[in-house]
Amino acid sequence: MKTGILLSLCYDGSNYHGWINQTNAISIQTTLNKAIKKVIKTGQFKTIGASKTDTNVHALDQKVLLIIYFTPILEKFIKAINKALPSDIKILDAKFVDPNFNIREVEYKIYHYYINDHQFDIFTNRYEYFWKHQKIDIIKLQEIFNLFIGEHEFKLFSGLKENEWNQYQTKRTIDDIKVLRINNKVVIQFKASGFIRYQIRIIIANCLNAYLNHKISTTKLVEMLQGIGKKTPFIIDAKGLVLQKIQFNKN
């Protein structure tokens, strides 16, 4: 009997090479699969993640569809898997779903990027980008990020190579971007149904450089959003990026 279980997962991505299985590196999915296999004593199962987070990216609400071939006592089953997992990965919640549940049918994903523009903190440094310049004017920075809200051509703001552009839908819509100040930290919130490889980190790096009037202008950003020109080399560290929430379509 095929059983589907929807897992809500949180993890510190610092020690992992992203979500997806890697041949020669340790990933979140590989580590989760290892823990599940230890509990059920078989390789007859499958995990599918809703978001392919990159190396050093963290998550508070990654969604994972687990397909197994028996019906467990859910609470005990999840407790056993959590016990087998390392301390930097944890299942927060689980529920039975149809095994054919489409985990890619996402209404929206919310990512947060954390910037410390106050005082260096060794205890939070692995979860944020330390800003070495003057305190950020969030109103000024918000005006730059507003250029990216809505439907645009994002191929020049992605990690895709030129020969990959035709393989992906690079014309995308970002529903909202908010620049917030929370507890002496700047939090940049992105909301969209999906993102291209490295898209958020490349957008942030370009906006911060435009904010500093460093090697790029807002005029150039507008042109790039039309697919005009070339990519810049700017990409911000992954460690400040957190997958905050995934919301599925209700129908």
Curated annotation (Swiss-Prot):
One MF term in the entry's GO annotations: RNA binding
Any Gene Ontology biological process: tRNA pseudouridine synthesis
Disulfide bonds: none
Enzyme Commission number, as recorded: 5.4.99.12
Enzymatic reactions: uridine(38/39/40) in tRNA = pseudouridine(38/39/40) in tRNA
One Pfam family named in its UniProt record: PseudoU_synth_1
Presence of keyword tRNA processing: yes
Summary of subunit composition and partner proteins: Homodimer.
Family, per entry: Belongs to the tRNA pseudouridine synthase TruA family.
Protein name per the record: tRNA pseudouridine synthase A
Organism of origin: Mycoplasma mycoides subsp. mycoides SC (strain CCUG 32753 / NCTC 10114 / PG1)
Lineage per the UniProt record: Bacteria, Bacillati, Mycoplasmatota, Mollicutes, Mycoplasmataceae
Gene: truA
